[in-house]
Amino acid sequence: MVSSVLEVSYVFCCPNRARGALSWNSGPGGLLAFGTSCSVVLYDPQKKVVITNLNGHTARVNCLHWIRTEDGSPSTELVSGASDNRVIHWELENNQVLKSVRLQGHEGPVYAVHGIYQSGPSDGEQHALIASAASDSTVRLWSKKGSEVKCLQILKFGDGFVLTVCLSTLPDTDAPVLACGDDGGRIHLFVQQDDWFQKMLSLCGHEDWIRGVEWATFGRDLFLASCSQDCLIRIWRLYMKPTSLETEDGSIRLKENTFTIKDGGVSTTVAVILETVLAGHENWVNAIHWQPSFYKDGVLHQPVRLLSASMDKTMILWAPDEESGVWLEQVRVGEVGGNTLGFYGCQFGENGSMIIAHAFHGAMHLWKQSTVNPRQWAPEIVISGHFDGVQDLIWDPEGEFIITTSTDQTTRLFAPWKKKNQSQVTWHEIARPQIHGYNLKCLAMIDRFQFVSGADEKVLRVFSAPRNFVENFSVISRQSLSHMLYDEDNDLPEGATVPALGLSNKAVFEGDMTYLTSEEEELLSPAFGYPQVIFQPAVLSEPPTEDHLLQNTLWPEVQKLYGHGYEIFCVTCNNSKTLLASACKAAQKEHAAIILWSTTSWKQVQSLAYHTLTVTQMAFSPDDKFLLAVSRDRTWSLWKRQDVTSAEFDPFFSLFAFTNKITSVHSRIIWSCDWSPDSKYFFTGSRDKKVVVWGECNSSYNPMEHPINPCSSILDVGSCVTAVSVCPVLNPAQRYIVAVGLESGKICIYSWSKTNQETKDWTSCVETTPSQSHTLGIRRLCWKSCSGSTEQSEEGTEWLDFASCGEDHTVKIYRVNRCAL
């Protein structure tokens, strides 16, 4: 098999903060589909990898649904709705997009979709019937047959909003029935008669917004489950009334709602009664899901089991008692600890042996049923990621993990999980070093287990890894613990905790830890308030669950750096790990100054003033002789390190070269910059769609005699450049490898070499396909250090790794074939 030039190795993401943004394909090996920003992600829970991305929406994906087959086999069609007012029907083959069709017509964001297969009255051929609800107070019915899509009908709800929809067919007929739950606590039932959906009745009972409705067929009865913000679940039974009239015998009967339909010229009376009310949740019930039918021993089974998810952080599995028929709570699972707000959705998977929920903060919680004790469910490892735009990322110096930071106010650490006696390696989030109260903006590694981060505040914060993290990281990634702790202080803290109403991670040492009794743990329940989260060390052999990440993987904060007048915007560290450079948002020259800090004394070394607006990115040259800065004022500045006479003195920098409004090639904000690995050239990328190479840089040159000018042709990439990164190694032709990230989400890889003919200096090597690309702007690109391990195949082909992050909430790791560039 011929390998491609560019591959996506790993993806880190999580579901959007929207009800209905997750759907699990029924059947063994079914894929989990969920919306991440503007993209639909297909994830394999068994292999724990992202299979592909479906990119087609231009705004947040709010809802999606696999169109399930009648025989319980895995579906190949998926429907999604988004805030771009569109519904997209995806047809898949071998888990890849075969074709997609846009259903346009809504005038507001789409918040609910559902679909079923329907046989045509004339030819009997199956086609998809799709219902979608949007904030324009309408529900639209669509028919998709082959490549033809048409809107069958528009149901208008005046000033009300339909929040959830579900389609099915009436028992013993082919008539589709539609249930719509609205913001008035009512469920509206529509039945298709003569190719037209007619309203039959409204079911009342809920006292708040309806958040979910779902049909399920059991025998000759059709059951409808509904959930609401009144904390209750109602189950309705719909059945065909016999034609023979029965005499009233005076017995007590449940109230019936009836309506009449015509099927083939025969009138049939349909009755709807309230089967039961389930009260077990203590907060809004956001989602319900019937267990799908599945084949067992060649027989199609439809279990009578219902799953519900609530804002009370629990998910409940309901089923009727075998003897009495009373619906009872069978299993309750949930989330403990942390500043979280409950579950938004839930799904059955793997023939009911697995259940999953996604939470307000994006985290997914997966549980698997024990084969020994069916009433026991254990947490499983599942994908995780940021739930807002990812602003910065960096590899550790040895290329063994990456740290990312985001406007979701968290810093996360992703590393490989190397299982014992298994060759397959998967990457997972293994720590959350910082959970902050401000949106995080930037970070830089100081050494392997120490980093500094900047947020929408004036302070830089420095964090160091605790002993518990280093020990767990060595086990999960199968690294030598003695090698990791070789240069570390023996007095490492065990972990960290955040005081109540505090923003600083306080170190916890072995003597500070208290182990709680069961009675003391009860006092930490929500009934007794929310006290300070207490760190509890744990020995891990696999990636941690969300509960553990929230409260047991923080890194202690060892230093605060004060000096900037406004919010921190960028930070970087030199290669010898002795100096930090930071800059903040600025509208005046005095605030746009770069501050240099010593990493040993944590004191300010120097303030470098040149730019008049915000410095957007900085980079030290690989030999640490220069510091490059680019700015919103459309210029760059190059600072030269001056030699000092004694080691007692900190180094200082002087302005070596710069551009101004006349000499600057760029006409818009310069977003990014990077150095060539030999420190001869530097690259700048701007919003004006240009990438320019500058040089040659030599600290022994006099900049007046040898000015630094563009030494390349201007590369126009066709979209705003937001990130530039130069690979630390050259391609086989000894050309520089440059990755360029665009505002459109695409990543392009070029090679460049200085030539006498400037028009031929740039070569386009490869660019990401739509499914490989981000869906919003790239924020940072970073190549893996080649001091780490570089994979080599049997043919001796070297693979280079780089990571990307963007405003689409996603972090990706790519592999690129060096010999093909």
UniProtKB/Swiss-Prot annotation:
Family: Belongs to the WD repeat ELP2 family.
Function: Component of the elongator complex which is required for multiple tRNA modifications, including mcm5U (5-methoxycarbonylmethyl uridine), mcm5s2U (5-methoxycarbonylmethyl-2-thiouridine), and ncm5U (5-carbamoylmethyl uridine). The elongator complex catalyzes the formation of carboxymethyluridine in the wobble base at position 34 in tRNAs.
PANTHER family listed in its UniProt record: ELONGATOR COMPLEX PROTEIN 2 (PTHR44111:SF1)
Pathway(s) served: tRNA modification; 5-methoxycarbonylmethyl-2-thiouridine-tRNA biosynthesis
Domains: entry comment: Folds into a two seven-bladed beta-propeller structure which is required for elongator complex assembly.
Residue stretches of each WD repeat: 56-100, 105-152, 160-200, 205-246, 280-328, 338-377, 385-424, 435-473, 563-607, 610-649, 665-704, 716-760, 773-821
Entries under Gene3D superfamilies matching the protein: YVTN repeat-like/Quinoprotein amine dehydrogenase (2.130.10.10)
Source species: Rattus norvegicus (Rat)
Protein name: Elongator complex protein 2
UniProt KW Secreted keyword: no
InterPro entries xref list: Elp2 (IPR037289), WD40/YVTN_repeat-like_dom_sf (IPR015943), WD40_repeat_dom_sf (IPR036322), WD40_rpt (IPR001680)
Compartment(s): Cytoplasm; Nucleus
MF term (GO), any: RNA polymerase II complex binding
Subunit and interaction comment: Component of the elongator complex which consists of ELP1, ELP2, ELP3, ELP4, ELP5 and ELP6. Interacts with STAT3 and JAKs.
Main location: cytoplasm
Keywords from the UniProt entry: Cytoplasm, Nucleus, Repeat, tRNA processing, WD repeat
GO biological process per UniProt: regulation of receptor signaling pathway via JAK-STAT; tRNA wobble uridine modification
